[in-house]
Swiss-Prot record:
Catalytic activity annotation: [[Fe-S] cluster scaffold protein carrying a second [4Fe-4S](2+) cluster] + N(6)-octanoyl-L-lysyl-[protein] + 2 oxidized [2Fe-2S]-[ferredoxin] + 2 S-adenosyl-L-methionine + 4 H(+) = [[Fe-S] cluster scaffold protein] + N(6)-[(R)-dihydrolipoyl]-L-lysyl-[protein] + 4 Fe(3+) + 2 hydrogen sulfide + 2 5'-deoxyadenosine + 2 L-methionine + 2 reduced [2Fe-2S]-[ferredoxin]
Protein name: Lipoyl synthase
PROSITE patterns per the UniProt record, alphabetical: RADICAL_SAM
Keywords assigned by UniProt, alphabetized: 4Fe-4S, Cytoplasm, Iron, Iron-sulfur, Metal-binding, S-adenosyl-L-methionine, Transferase
Location in the cell: Cytoplasm
Domain named Radical SAM core: residues: 79-295
Gene Ontology terms, MF aspect: 4 iron, 4 sulfur cluster binding; lipoate synthase activity; metal ion binding
Length: 314
């Protein structure tokens, strides 16, 4: 059953509200650091030469990756394979989510040369599948949609690659932003719901569960041949019943690719892990999602939204 649309608050008021939101934890949540189970142990590659080389290339071209900014647990593996998820529009987010490691505050000016720089690096690295994401830019009139479109166009002008974009919610400009991106549509359109609606005020201040669903649905309506994708991170206090509800909502709004992974606390200043989901629990969730009609489901402790993203086309 679809959820009714919600009222969108004035964007300038939203921006101010996000600047003053304190990260605080409620007394009915576990604030203790849970011991990591064995299945969360990460194996690092023996050689780090490829990691160093890729990092050097990124710095030379003044490019950011969400792998680094969000402290992704798969960074070593992906960098060692020569892959990365590029983060455009700077490294400073205009929102402050207590589960996220990306820096927040007053963002920098948009680098107009970034699309060309990005296309050049992708060409030099001989990448066949690229994932592009961004920080939230509530300060920009179009929320960064035109910059996404410019990046896609520049990459296609220079490279024969498949492009996946992982976008923010374009608050207050959702329809306009989707139309802009539809001028240069990606091969896959991704927007993460992150978690269940009950926890949104706590972990996603400034975001709206309904708005995110509407974004995915509207883009699919404009681009029926482009697969839409979304992801969740678990271990924030959600229940299995709530997870199932979100999975149903995503399918009902046209999403066919799903990623689900374990939340990891970036630092002691971030929201603490409430539970480590077991591999068997992840398997149960994956089987449910596949049983109701999802085409691809990547579900496991270390899964992230862009992890092995190219496998959708295999």
């Amino acid at each position: 059953m679809r959820t009714k649309n919600s009222k969108i608050i004035n964007s300038e008021q939203d921006i101010f509200r996000n600047k003053v939101i304190p990260i605080k934890f409620l007394s009915n949540y576990n604030n203790e650091i849970l011991k990591k189970p064995q299945w969360m142990k990460i194996k690092f590659p023996v050689s780090t030469n490829k990691i160093k080389n890729l990092t050097l290339i990124l710095r030379q071209h003044n490019l950011n990756t969400v792998c680094e900014q969000a402290l992704c647990p798969n960074l070593a593996e992906c960098f060692n394979r020569g892959t990365a998820t590029f983060m455009i529009l700077g490294s400073i987010c205009t929102r402050r989510c207590p589960f996220c490691a990306v820096s927040h505050g007053k963002p920098s000016l948009v680098n107009k040369n970034e699309p060309q720089q990005l296309a050049r690096v992708i060409f030099d690295m001989k990448i066949n599948y690229v994932v592009i994401t961004s920080v939230v830019r509530d300060d920009l009139k179009d929320r960064g949609a035109q910059h996404f479109s410019n990046c896609i166009q520049e990459i296609r002008n220079k490279n024969n690659v498949k492009i996946e974009i992982l976008v923010p919610d374009f608050r207050g400009m959702m329809r306009e932003s989707c139309k802009i991106i539809s001028m240069n549509p990606p091969n896959v359109f991704n927007h993460n719901l992150e978690n269940v609606p009950r926890l949104y005020k706590l972990i996603r201040p400034g975001a709206s569960y309904i708005r995110s669903l509407k974004l995915l649905e509207f883009f699919k309506k404009l681009n029926p041949n482009v697969p839409t994708k979304s992801g969740l991170i678990l271990g924030l206090g959600e229940t299995y019943k709530e997870i199932v509800h979100v999975i149903n909502d995503l399918l009902d709004h046209g999403v066919t690719i799903l990623t689900i992974g374990q939340y990891l606390q970036p630092s002691s200043k971030h929201f603490p892990v409430q539970k480590y989901i077991t591999p068997d629990e992840f398997k149960k969730i994956k089987n449910y999602a596949l049983s109701i009609g999802f085409k691809k489901v990547f579900c496991g402790p270390l899964i992230r939204s862009s992890y092995h993203a190219e496998k959708y086309f295999e």
